[in-house]
């Protein structure tokens, strides 16, 4: 991968009072809650809203009355929360200033703000490209308790710390037993975790009563970092489990972090260093909830040229694995897709990852490295995967950005083909909306570090539906940024503000 606490509560909002009164342990999911990165542990990036049809997409417009002010740079995806029985909802936005903002989802006014400590100045790190460094990985919400979990890079006495917080959505207060200092607790178990060299860009996830946090390095691959997954028991936050790569490097740094299905976690690792034998890099790894190491070929995959990928910094870790099912002659086929910086797509059997060289299908699908997070949706029993990159099967010769959609068909040897391509200037992570789970799919993407606009395309043929030309150019969009959808709005997080689009 080269590439003390303060709380400010804004009073006087009746809508905020209604909202926080309804947050309780009996909370249950509203239809448009967005609790984690890409709207679920599978990281599909799919949202279902009957009202967002192809026709309605043409009339999407910027909500210029939406305030949406936050402090600091924004790399993490916003989340959306409506408590059980509440008539209003909130956006949760975490920033590199180590602040968490709860905003009213309609007006954008502040409900509460929580500061989690001093972010890390770049001068305290050996390398990296985020300054200051605070909250980068997308948090996750536990709907059963009304709690948001996140990892914050905190500087204390000029020493970097990774601290995992649990905050009440009622008022942003820290729950008892939190935060957890990752390096300190692991050290108690005689494990070495170098908080200065470990970066936390990937999204957190919740599975079976545990919080899982992925770690990689910083841009520049400096210091003694490894790919880590740390599990924290929600009932006993002082109880940690962990898995790490055997070789140095192998970071888990994609914005989607950890994908999950059932009781299984899936991660993609980056390039390792000085590994003469395969040591967990350039891989898709399945982990059980206790994070024990498995040497079973069914629980890992790496390309046969893993060592060459190491040497070229062409790792699989730039995108998170995505899980999906397709139709085949023998019924539904459980698959997983990995996309590499080498421009290749690897289709794996989700129940048997196959070990080294064990993919079901592999194809060159991009002329340039594939980064960020893909989105996946289904049509007619086949899977479609959208990513921002210069597609190998695309006719255009765009060099400043392209949206590529692959079609994956089932079978003993699944086929990978290019469904359609469209030019989009930028580098972000797309999402997909449908009206019922499959009908009228729309691929949405923002021109992060490009044209700064929102774009929407028909998912079946790539026809442009919305190009954002009548709306604002969104300033402060960082690469890998994605957006979220609710039943009547789209939201995009950017430096010091959130943009809202109504439909």
Short names for language-model regions:
Residues 400-405, 410-429:
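Detector for outer-membrane/organellar transmembrane beta-barrel domains
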Residues 9-22:
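Bacterial N-terminal signal peptides
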Residues 1-6:
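N-terminal secretory signal peptides that target proteins for export/translocation
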Residues 25-29:
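Boundary at the C-terminal end of the N-terminal hydrophobic targeting segment
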Residues 357-367, 416-420, 470:
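Inter-blade linker and blade-boundary elements of WD-repeat/beta-propeller domains
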Residues 30-291, 297-327, 333-355, 366, ...:
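Mobile, glycine-rich extracellular loop/lid and propeptide segments
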